[in-house]
């Protein structure tokens, strides 16, 4: 029986074989590698991955799809909302210090998923995700550009990232109304040590009114914390490089 894509799950199934092959080449799975796929859907990417890996863990929220996937002998199925999955526990279950994570992420909750994985980054070797191209543009954006924002700072602090593949709407069934792309995310081996909640709060405050000078937003936040250091607040949030936000978070942690 044909599966009807569920709008509430943001389901758009990959159907272009050429694109699927290109994604698998970008991921470059090796036999025995511990890997988790988020949102396997109709297994378009799952099948070529598991053929190369031998075994694959998948996270699927849709109960009908999860039931189908369980019939595949080489898949371990976690039927759950990915935002509730403890990836450290998954790594432990796979006897792995680090796992690889891949997926065609639901576009309506892609940012929360990225932040959820950021909290588990210590057990992640790398990530390859299909996302809305506009989201990837924000992830990899440089300072002083309109795409540079909270997502850019939080993810660039912890990952080296690159856009590895453009994916047009007609590669999906049903086609989304936006262009897509695949991003590669490799955690930095020795990231700057800091309090992640402090960096998160600091960056959120800084970009809360991005057109205003930082003295109106971050300046007040620093005053409230009785910050005694020096930080130029006569700039807009988008003009401050990641390294300066990180250094400030370290001073405030």
UniProtKB/Swiss-Prot annotation:
Task: Tell me its EC number(s), please.
Answer: 2.1.1.182
Instruction: Give the CC-aspect GO terms.
Output: cytosol
**Entry keyword annotation includes Cytoplasm:** yes
Q: What is its main location?
A: cytoplasm
- One Pfam family, short name please? RrnaAD
Residues holding S-adenosyl-L-methionine: 12, 14, 39, 60, 81, 104
Show the catalytic activity: adenosine(1518)/adenosine(1519) in 16S rRNA + 4 S-adenosyl-L-methionine = N(6)-dimethyladenosine(1518)/N(6)-dimethyladenosine(1519) in 16S rRNA + 4 S-adenosyl-L-homocysteine + 4 H(+)
Q: Which UniProt keywords apply?
A: Cytoplasm, Methyltransferase, RNA-binding, rRNA processing, S-adenosyl-L-methionine, Transferase
Q: Does the keyword DNA repair apply?
A: no
Q: GO molecular function, one example? A: 16S rRNA (adenine(1518)-N(6)/adenine(1519)-N(6))-dimethyltransferase activity
Compartment(s) of residence = Cytoplasm
Alphabetized SUPFAM superfamilies for the sequence: S-adenosyl-L-methionine-dependent methyltransferases (SSF53335)
Question: Which protein family is it in?
Answer: Belongs to the class I-like SAM-binding methyltransferase superfamily. rRNA adenine N(6)-methyltransferase family. RsmA subfamily.
Q: What does this protein do?
A: Specifically dimethylates two adjacent adenosines (A1518 and A1519) in the loop of a conserved hairpin near the 3'-end of 16S rRNA in the 30S particle. May play a critical role in biogenesis of 30S subunits.
Protein name, per record? Ribosomal RNA small subunit methyltransferase A
| Organism name | Acidovorax sp. (strain JS42)
């Amino acid at each position: 029986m044909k599966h009807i894509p569920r709008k509430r799950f943001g389901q758009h199934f990959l159907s272009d074989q050429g694109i699927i092959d290109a994604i698998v080449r970008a991921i470059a799975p090796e036999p025995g590698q511990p890997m988790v796929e988020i949102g396997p859907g109709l297994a378009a990417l799952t099948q070529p991955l598991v053929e190369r890996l031998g075994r694959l863990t998948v996270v699927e929220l849709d109960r009908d799809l999860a039931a189908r996937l369980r019939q595949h002998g080489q898949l371990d199925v976690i039927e759950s909302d990915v935002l509730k999955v403890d990836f450290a526990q998954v790594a432990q279950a796979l006897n792995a210090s680090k796992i690889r994570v891949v997926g065609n992420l639901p576009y309506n909750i892609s940012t929360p998923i990225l932040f959820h994985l950021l909290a588990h980054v210590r057990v992640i070797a790398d990530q390859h995700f299909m996302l809305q191209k506009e989201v990837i543009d924000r992830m990899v954006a440089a300072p002083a550009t309109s795409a540079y924002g909270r997502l850019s700072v939080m993810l660039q602090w912890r990952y080296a990232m690159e856009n590895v593949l453009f994916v047009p709407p007609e590669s999906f069934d049903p086609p989304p109304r936006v262009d897509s792309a695949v991003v590669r995310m490799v955690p930095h081996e020795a990231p700057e040590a800091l309090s992640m909640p402090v960096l998160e709060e600091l960056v959120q405050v800084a970009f809360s009114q991005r057109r205003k000078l930082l003295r109106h937003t971050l300046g007040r936040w620093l005053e409230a914390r009785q910050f005694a250091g020096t930080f130029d607040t006569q700039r807009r949030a988008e003009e401050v490089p990641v390294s300066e936000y990180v250094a400030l978070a370290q001073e405030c942690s």
